[in-house]
């Protein structure tokens, strides 16, 4: 299939987990009814984002949130990239994205590889490593449309991860994310366009809607970028479902016109995975 519809659910996350789950499911169903074949939720879609919240909202996988995602994916017959939730496993906490197929099967579980530890004086300091542990595996899943690679938020800053996914045959990279009011306006779109252009892939980011009253204010602006580096769809800061057509024939044409994949000097340099 040369084309398919991707939808990103950007919704306002509240402190009430049940409200978040109900809202997410409602918007997922709306996207599916309008023809979406792959749907993605934002980072930390079931809980507020913050180191104090992660232990409070953490769940096992399978658990309440992921079981609900499995059910709605099966009900709608879609591929569902379940944003991320705080996951508890063997006494450790992870920022984890669970992906489900049209039959409700768990296809992949991506634990955020690169933890969000930054300190911009006078603007923002955040240390995910105060409560979270990093993941240590790549996350790729197959669909009838194309192969998809998954990262979470800060993972997008690392060009190597995107290149490894592209080398594995991914044509779409999806990053549930929650950039903030400092890094969002400066880097959010830039990083997406860079990853798309570098690897000649589609890149999509699903953000929570902006809540000015939250302790951590998300930038919003969920986005879909083409392999030409062009923004094909971009949300504002409010709650919405953003959709775009992913055109794999267009991707193939770009790769043929500018054949960087064949032109790389692997005799001089290479990016490779250390663990499978």
UniProtKB/Swiss-Prot annotation:
InterPro entries: C-N_Hydrolase, C-N_Hydrolase_sf, Nit1/2_C-N_Hydrolase. The keyword GTP-binding does not apply. Gene3D superfamilies: Carbon-nitrogen hydrolase. One of its GO terms (cellular component) is mitochondrion. The gene is nit2a. Keywords: Cytoplasm, Hydrolase. Has omega-amidase activity. The role of omega-amidase is to remove potentially toxic intermediates by converting 2-oxoglutaramate and 2-oxosuccinamate to biologically useful 2-oxoglutarate and oxaloacetate, respectively. One of its GO terms (molecular function) is omega-amidase activity. GO terms for biological process: asparagine metabolic process; glutamine metabolic process; oxaloacetate metabolic process. It is found in: Cytoplasm. This is Omega-amidase NIT2-A.
């Amino acid at each position: 299939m040369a084309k398919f519809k991707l939808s990103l659910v950007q919704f306002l996350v509240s402190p009430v987990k049940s409200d978040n789950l109900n809202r997410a499911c409602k918007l997922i169903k709306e996207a599916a009814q309008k023809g979406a074949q792959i749907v993605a939720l934002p980072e930390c879609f079931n809980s507020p984002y913050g180191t104090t919240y992660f232990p409070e909202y953490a769940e096992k996988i399978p658990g309440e949130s992921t079981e609900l995602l499995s059910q709605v994916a099966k009900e709608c017959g879609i591929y569902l990239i379940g944003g991320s939730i705080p996951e508890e496993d063997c006494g450790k906490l992870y920022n984890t994205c669970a992906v489900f197929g049209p039959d409700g099967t768990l296809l992949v579980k991506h634990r955020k590889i690169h933890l969000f530890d930054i300190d911009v004086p006078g603007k923002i300091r955040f240390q995910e490593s105060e409560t979270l542990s990093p993941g240590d595996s790549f996350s790729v899943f197959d669909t009838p449309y194309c192969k998809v690679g998954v990262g979470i938020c800060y993972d997008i800053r690392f060009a190597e991860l995107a290149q490894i996914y592209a080398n594995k045959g991914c044509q779409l990279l999806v990053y549930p994310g929650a950039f903030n009011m400092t890094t969002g306006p400066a880097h959010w779109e830039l990083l997406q366009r860079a990853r798309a252009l570098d690897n000649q892939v589609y890149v999509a980011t699903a953000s929570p809607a902006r809540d000015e009253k939250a302790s951590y204010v998300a930038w919003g602006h969920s986005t879909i970028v083409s392999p030409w580096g062009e923004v094909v769809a971009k949300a504002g800061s409010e709650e919405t479902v953003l959709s775009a057509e992913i055109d794999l024939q267009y991707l193939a044409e770009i790769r043929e016109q500018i054949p960087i994949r064949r032109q790389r000097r692997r005799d001089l340099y290479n990016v490779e995975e250390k663990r499978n």
